[in-house]
């Protein structure tokens, strides 16, 4: 009896009701923290005395009620009786109390009796007696019906929960429908039967949807507290840590609380910027929706390139935007640019274009700027922040412009505003005694002159007045906030400001090792104020406890402390990490970029993590800034040689420890079990043996394989000796060339359920494709 009573009371616990509220300001007994309720109906810590005074002034002019965590109307506004403002509230001494779990108002057993007013058990409000139902406890027929429907829904929810907790019971028991045979006419009874049948259809539909979303829900439940433990709360956490949240006023509009809900739906089509090639606009599809964030998929490409953005991101646009503004749209894979048509494509895909009203950037007020397309400037290379290079403005949209580095490919381009700290006027490097990286191939690097270069390129410098100074961000050390985890972008975690500089902050994820800290721009859309997740409906990952760090490997199958087995360093989201080599949080992957082939060119990044990802340093090595780059290149080369020598030595020692019966068997085993970590081109004997064992693979580069369709991958698998029957498996799983190159031996054996022998041949063919790609680059 005691347990049931406590559980019942726990269900109806409301954090708002335990606070002391006065003039719109709530205080927690035993605490000095003060709270207010913002426009979203959620709690917000008051950190400024002026802010508290504003709350009191605003409350003095309105009739205030105790708020709810999720303000949801119990019935449509049109169904409620329209009372004068003075009556549409709770009388003094009887505030409206809402459930924190459901967001619905509790039924008050003993409402305050007020002469001339009738209390409604559904609305928990008071209205004129004349306008309420005669002799009833409801203000309207809709309110009475709502209470009845709510009771039935609660019964069904209880039965569904029981079925999910005990699958065996779900096979034995069928959901019961409460059919109340009151004294009604035959017509009313038939109406009830129809309503009950409709409820059954809705119930079955929700069960199917639940099964379909099981994968995502399992991930989202990671943030839910275990049974018997209290739910994590920002207010309690701040008090325990004696910490303060970053004031909401320090966040930019695109970081702060949104004004509208996220209206995007899965399957909607739109146009947007490729974050890895920011000069390229692509056809995108909404793959997932979570709170105020959406996950976007490049049509026709592997889902390993999917990326998350906020619903109000400036880089997404409605269908037809590129055609309207004169921008080039990159069509889906397999479509020709001149043949692509949005209307035809939407009909073919049976898809819906995202409504224009969902795009917040359609109503931006454009501020006059001194920048024009073609103007020159000096800009920081974000991929190598120590480099400041010669750059050009190549595009302008609203209040932003695209920075392109002269004579480099577009993968280094980025969008920025006039106040960006990454851009400087012509001559800034000379004035501040910084080295300016000149365009590759430019003659007379040591005597580079801006005047001469501007004349040669027939261009103008961006005027100094066009560059705006960004004010200090105001973030301070030890302040708390919510940050998107760049290593696993589906997660937003509780974080602390570990350090600051002029325009960046170093974030630390609470409970995690300091090695995961990283710097991020203070105006990045991936940082948010405390409470952003709760207000937008996005799961927030609470700080890791020492116990969770110990138990992580048991639950997630990954040995990395803190990792719950979600996310993958080398491929798409649905393949969880099976080892430290694949875990985005493992030590070996800590400072690496994800190993994906370039989406447009199909080229793989350098195999060795010692080499910088970009080509600019190597290409410009002999032409500009020799003091900086030559030293950097020597360090890289020395590190690479040490790693290679160590790996080769380890490989030879391992081979020497095992003696095979015959030379032929030794050659065969070495060819089959060769690891891609060893530089294959440096071992001609091994390369020769692999080519003999897999003749259909020799000479095919990975860039060509990445463009294969699912049918071509299937045909290739069938061409391998002993793998004829496995081609259909790859076709059924819709594995194209890009996905094929990202597979590991473990994936082929465990996920594809292919025996070890054929799996080794398939995996070695992948290694040979990559080696052939590397050979072709070396020859060039």
From Swiss-Prot:
Keywords: Chromatin regulator, Isopeptide bond, Metal-binding, Nucleus, Phosphoprotein, Repeat, Transcription, Transcription regulation, Ubl conjugation, Zinc, Zinc-finger. The modification Phosphoserine is found at residue 608. GO terms for molecular function: chromatin binding; histone binding; identical protein binding; methylation-dependent protein binding; zinc ion binding. Residues 600-710 are annotated as: Interaction with DCAF5. Residues 157-166, 185-194 have a biased composition (Acidic residues). SMART domains: MBT (SM00561), SAM (SM00454). The gene is L3MBTL3. Interacts with RNF2. Interacts (via SAM domain) with SAMD1 (via SAM domain); the interaction mediates L3MBTL3 binding to chromatin. Interacts with RBPJ; the interaction is required for L3MBTL3 localization to chromatin and is impaired by Notch-derived peptides containing the intracellular domain (NICD). Interacts (via SAM domain) with KDM1A. Interacts with DCAF5. Interacts with DNMT1. Interacts with E2F1. Interacts with SOX2. Interacts with SFMBT1. There is a cross-link at residues 637, 704 (Glycyl lysine isopeptide (Lys-Gly) (interchain with G-Cter in SUMO2)). The lineage of its organism: Eukaryota, Metazoa, Chordata, Craniata, Vertebrata. Residues 1-64 are annotated as: Interaction with RBPJ. Required for transcription repressor activity on Notch target genes. MBT repeats lie at residues 232-332, 340-439, 448-543. PROSITE patterns: MBT, SAM_DOMAIN, ZF_CCHHC. It comes from Homo sapiens. Residues 643-661 have a biased composition (Basic and acidic residues). Residues 149-220, 597-665 are annotated as: Disordered. Its main location: nucleus. Residues 708-772 form the SAM domain. GO terms for cellular component: nucleolus; nucleoplasm; nucleus. One of its GO terms (biological process) is negative regulation of DNA-templated transcription. This is Lethal(3)malignant brain tumor-like protein 3.
